[in-house]
Amino acid sequence: GINVLSDKPMAINSQSFKLLEECFAIAKQKNIMLYDIMTERNEITTMLQRELSTIPAVYGEQLKGSPEEPAIVKESVHHLFKLVDNKPLTRPVWYLDVNQQGEGIVDVTTHLVDLVQWEAFPDQIIDYKKDIELIDANRWTTSISPEEFKQVTGTDAYPDFLKKDVENDTLKVYCNGDIVYKIKGVTAKVSVIWNYTFPKGGGDTHFSVMKGSKADLVIRQGKEQNYQPELFVEAVKGVDLAAYEKDLTASMEKVSAEYPGVALNKVGDGVWQVEIPAKYRVGHEAHFGQVTEHFLDYLKEGKLPDWEVPNMLAKYYTTTSALDMAKAKK
């Protein structure tokens, strides 16, 4: 058998989820590893958000939330056409075929669902049969004109396999989706939106919040942050701010022992920005190398951490069941 380090998504619908379960069973039997590439766990703002959420003096207890007010939210906005190193990014034509790439609700959401699990339940096993409860799921299309199609793929005409998604010359791709669900009793929401492109000076955006009884840990990546993710600690109403600031400052000293240079900057009443030195912002491409290093360590040890396989299954169960739920809506 072959050890496999796979790009996400490993499953894009319920059928492939069943197949994935079989693959994990075979891997276990043959003592080989099957692992997906979760680059976003190596993004520094996410690592620090996770770290701070494990410190009761900073975070308090994880709130349970509700469908109207989820206690964990992760939303990202991506763009089909963009410049990478000042050159237009050309995407393969099949990238726009949901039967090959997967719909948005089962593609990039894989990362967001992974982070909900990894941050809120670190090193804990999640059993999808009893720990996951879907509440709501939606999917919708992004329209791409023939000119835009040519610009992003470099191809003149829609191939036959995309004709199913063309209406009046416009390609409609189901690349957007959101999922509201409960994981071990905590209500979470993930959402992925793909627009065609962004206005000049714009970029991909990300928003994430984890809500604790003492503070919200918020990642913002928007215009104000120059499209670079930044982490904020926002004390909840009713907290004694003077006492909280002492606790937060003391806790940050422990964090900066592990991440030298990371510091707090008070930006408002009960609001602090976590200052992150540039050396920690290694960029998306470097994360692939970091994931590979982890995988090679696991190969040396001869096993994945106990929680990884059940949690991969929980993750793909969540995304593929959400697709079924969203498709069932008319």
Each model region followed by its residue ranges:
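Conserved structured core elements
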Residues: 14-18, 43, 110, 173, ...
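C-terminal helical cap and adjacent loop that interface with cofactors, partners, or active-site loops
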Residues: 107, 112, 116-117, 124, ...
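Short secondary-structure boundary/capping segments
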Residues: 21, 50-57, 224-228
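Glycine- and acidic
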Residues: 5-6, 36, 79, 95-102, ...
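Beta-strand-loop-alpha-helix segment that lines the small-molecule cofactor/substrate pocket
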Residues: 1-41
